[in-house]
């Protein structure tokens, strides 16, 4: 019998909650020449759909991107093998929606529950954008490029930058439906700094916020800062006293930075609750554990992933990889940490596994330069997006080793390899996949209906 007419026995099943997508649980035969499209036709026929629904297929957790015959050959299986084939609604290609122009390179992004976008820029300004591309507010105060921004709530945010500080910002008057953060904030105007957080000795490049009013910051001074979103809970810093005590030890540049900050003499200054030390190289990203905010993670140019007990401020686990790590995202349902690296790939790690066990569970390959930003899909536990200095954003399903889709920069003035580096990505359920970088653009690729219903 020719390979074209050969068949394999299989069973289709799905984990989709929609009962209308469930086929009868019974084995059947299918041509081994079928690929994704042909299998999708078979499932639609079994479901009796007049309007076809595109599906993706997995065998033993591996996303099928080849024919059944090629799959059998790849895994050394014969056509006598019985296959359990999982199907799930296919992901549609994210289409370009819009882009907004900024004054300088955009280093960081976040999206609030109000669907407002905040951006941090190399011109030292934090901006709030609506989805029409209008700047609603600008927040000035940092004396150097901003490297990280994060919403605390719809009325509070935090930023960090090359001036070695974090700033707590008031974005608007408190909504009466939300709890009051600080009773004496009423004297602070919208768009003003609530407090300057000092303690790092090098640029602050990463920030994460927990739901229990805590902040983590990663810095190029090799430390992680642990702070409160409520400034009253932190120790007061007296800038004049510090300047006086350290005047003889401070460099000229340090003295200049300190004098610049003294211009904001009326702004509160606070010290960290703790500075966590263990890394031997710059800390590139930090994150609270999705399920337990007393646990934190950090990745560094020193090649390590560290797990922290934030109650005791102790490092409780270190995993050493072969490359500098530049970005971090959690896949909480899968209990995995995704790490972007200087080696151009993304590695998946299980933080529960001891450092003596296998360090890397999987590797995603496709980028051609540093992978500097990651974010997970809000609607699919297996998916994430990545931003790279190669000028692209890639969409991944971690069950496959190669990207599903590649998003390029839409700006006409972008020159490949010159001004196309992507510095930040964010995947929002309501807004879409947002990316920004060296082209001074905030780009949105359509996220609505990315999963066909």
Curated annotation (Swiss-Prot):
Gene3D superfamilies: YVTN repeat-like/Quinoprotein amine dehydrogenase. InterPro entries: G-protein_beta_WD-40_rep (IPR020472), NLE (IPR012972), WD40/YVTN_repeat-like_dom_sf (IPR015943), WD40_repeat_CS (IPR019775), WD40_repeat_dom_sf (IPR036322), WD40_rpt (IPR001680), WDR12/Ytm1 (IPR028599). Pfam families: NLE, WD40. Its main location: nucleus. GO terms for molecular function: ribonucleoprotein complex binding. It comes from the Eukaryota. WD repeats lie at residues 101-139, 141-179, 199-237, 278-318, 320-359, 366-406, 417-453. Keywords: Nucleus, Repeat, Ribosome biogenesis, rRNA processing, WD repeat. CDD domains: WD40. One of its GO terms (cellular component) is PeBoW complex. It is found in: Nucleus, Nucleolus; Nucleus, Nucleoplasm. SUPFAM superfamilies: WD40 repeat-like (SSF50978). PANTHER family: RIBOSOME BIOGENESIS PROTEIN WDR12, WD40 REPEAT PROTEIN 12, 37. Belongs to the WD repeat WDR12/YTM1 family. Component of the NOP7 complex, which is required for maturation of the 25S and 5.8S ribosomal RNAs and formation of the 60S ribosome. Component of the NOP7 complex, composed of ERB1, NOP7 and YTM1. The complex is held together by ERB1, which interacts with NOP7 via its N-terminal domain and with YTM1 via a high-affinity interaction between the seven-bladed beta-propeller domains of the 2 proteins. The NOP7 complex associates with the 66S pre-ribosome. Interacts (via UBL domain) with MDN1 (via VWFA/MIDAS domain). This is Ribosome biogenesis protein YTM1.
